[in-house]
């Protein structure tokens, strides 16, 4: 399961959180508001809102900010329309990228994404040129400082988890996208997760040297600095010294 682990990426993002807190919060607030606008403010009947709130909590967003974002979404009568866009691209050294965007201006987003890619040696791919390298899975992560590994594994397997991966102080439970809600609900009866999301996990990862990794990560960070970009998924293997 080590080939699928996102934990090195998660650690990298957490390490950069303080410097980019405002920008991260802006993206999360937008996602929460739109989820509430589309499906209402009840997390029990709105899975998208539940996942968005979970991401916000992992990023240490204050509860008050989350509640304001929900209220904003529910009460949004401005008629502003947001679009979800996904771009597939190749970075240097054949690293595959899936760029998820949320925007009220498709042309602006397309132009900016293309510009960042071209200036950093990357190229936009046709739909399907990259996505086949990833699989949509449920990802649930727990801290082993809080819970015994064997208890999490036992309940996860009983609930129907596809795979389990542990490293250091973290354990990840992998599910199918279809069974994610059911399995996470079972696990939530005993354990509080650090992360619970539907994620695109790479079938295989590309290993590069430190200099090459730095260049690819620089591109990813430039894409993530653009407000319309919500997430950049990749198949790069992050080595320890990069974290």
From Swiss-Prot:
A GO cellular-component term linked to this record: cytosol
Gene3D superfamilies reported for this sequence: 1.10.10.200, 3.30.70.980
GO biological process, one term: regulation of DNA-templated transcription
Keywords on record: Cytoplasm, DNA-binding, Transcription, Transcription regulation
Primary site of residence: cytoplasm
Domain of life: Bacteria
A molecular function GO annotation: DNA binding
Compartment annotation: Cytoplasm
Keyword Transcription regulation: yes
The protein's name in its UniProt record: Probable transcriptional regulatory protein BH0025
Classification of source organism: Bacteria, Pseudomonadati, Spirochaetota, Spirochaetia, Spirochaetales
């Amino acid at each position: 399961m080590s080939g699928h682990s996102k934990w090195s990426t998660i650690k990298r993002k957490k390490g950069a959180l303080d410097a980019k807190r405002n920008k991260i919060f802006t993206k999360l607030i937008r996602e929460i508001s739109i989820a509430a606008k589309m499906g209402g403010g009840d997390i029990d009947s709105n899975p998208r809102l539940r996942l968005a709130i979970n991401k916000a909590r992992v990023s240490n967003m204050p509860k008050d900010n989350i509640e304001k974002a929900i209220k904003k979404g529910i009460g949004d009568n401005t008629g502003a329309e947001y679009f979800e866009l996904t771009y597939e691209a190749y970075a240097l050294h054949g690293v595959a990228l899936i760029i998820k965007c949320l925007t009220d201006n498709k042309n602006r987003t397309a132009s900016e994404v293309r510009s960042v890619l071209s200036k950093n040696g990357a190229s936009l791919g046709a739909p399907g040129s990259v996505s086949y390298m990833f699989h949509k899975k449920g990802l649930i992560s727990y801290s082993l400082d809080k819970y015994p590994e064997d208890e999490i594994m036992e309940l996860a397997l009983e609930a129907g988890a596809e795979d389990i991966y542990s490293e250091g102080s973290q354990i990840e439970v992998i599910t199918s996208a279809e069974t994610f809600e059911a399995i996470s609900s079972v696990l939530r009866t005993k354990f509080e997760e650090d992360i619970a999301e539907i994620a695109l996990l790479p079938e295989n990862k590309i290993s590069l040297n430190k200099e090459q990794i730095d260049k690819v990560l620089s591109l990813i960070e430039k894409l993530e600095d653009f407000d319309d970009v919500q997430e950049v998924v990749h198949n790069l293997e992050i080595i320890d010294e990069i974290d």
